Amino acid sequence: MALLEICCYSMECALTAQQNGADRVELCAAPKEGGLTPSLGVLKSVRQRVTIPVHPIIRPRGGDFCYSDGEFAAILEDVRTVRELGFPGLVTGVLDVDGNVDMSRMEKIMAAAGPLAVTFHRAFDMCANPLNTLNNLAELGIARVLTSGQKSDALQGLSKIMELIAHRDAPIIMAGAGVRAENLHHFLDAGVLEVHSSAGAWQASPMRYRNQGLSMSSDAHADEYSRYVVDGAAVAEMKGIIERHQAK
């Protein structure tokens, strides 16, 4: 049966995902940045309360995946922290200036991660040569690759995803970006074994007093009185679709 991973941005969201049938959680911060490394406090609270596998993302900033020496040092320290806290896996990825896997840095990450299952995230979708990259990731011992098939969403990239799955000795290929209940059957029918979804929605802040003339964001138009949460009903719906597909 296909595995359902839910992207979560808080301990509460991880619990919601677990309670509604998620098989695994990718734990992140900063949804508007596409997911950054969670704080130590969030990591500890999730480790204490969530029982399904949780893989934190290790990503120090938004933007591209070519990091300064200081950023890479922080990545290695965060990898060690996640390992020490007892998480079963993590999610990360580093590219060089030419859009190739930075093999030297990834080897250091893999050494720091030790027995943890490492997912190479959607840095893969920004790489220059996906098949060469897949070979490099297999050589590194990467457990899985999260990808949209190098398109803006995974449905558009499904043909590339299937090409990657068929590639000899490839890591597990997990489809992600825009995967929802309404299009999930396309991935299941194609034989995708792992899917990744935010299954989320923006929820209004409970704040009654709102200073509308002031923003804490560099984006003056950002809505600071909403937060991104996992929709438990959406998770349950996706899990049900997977179970019914398996029963066919």
Curated annotation (Swiss-Prot):
Q: Give the species this sequence originates from.
A: Escherichia coli O157:H7
Give GO cellular component annotations, separated by semicolons.
cytoplasm
- Which lineage do the record's taxonomy fields give for this organism? Bacteria, Pseudomonadati, Pseudomonadota, Gammaproteobacteria, Enterobacterales
How is the quaternary structure described? Answer: Homodimer.
Gene3D superfamilies to which the protein is assigned, alphabetical: Copper homeostasis (CutC) domain
For this UniProt entry, the molecular function terms from Gene Ontology, in alphabetical order, are: copper ion binding
User: What is the similarity comment for this entry?
Assistant: Belongs to the CutC family.
Q: Does the keyword Cytoplasm apply?
A: yes
- The source's domain of life comes to Bacteria
Which of UniProt's keywords are assigned here?
A: Cytoplasm
Predominant localisation class = cytoplasm
Q: Does the keyword Cytoplasm apply?
A: yes
Q: Which Pfam families does the record match to this protein?
A: CutC
Q: Which InterPro entries match?
A: CutC-like, CutC-like_dom_sf
Subcellular compartments: Cytoplasm
Recorded protein name is PF03932 family protein CutC
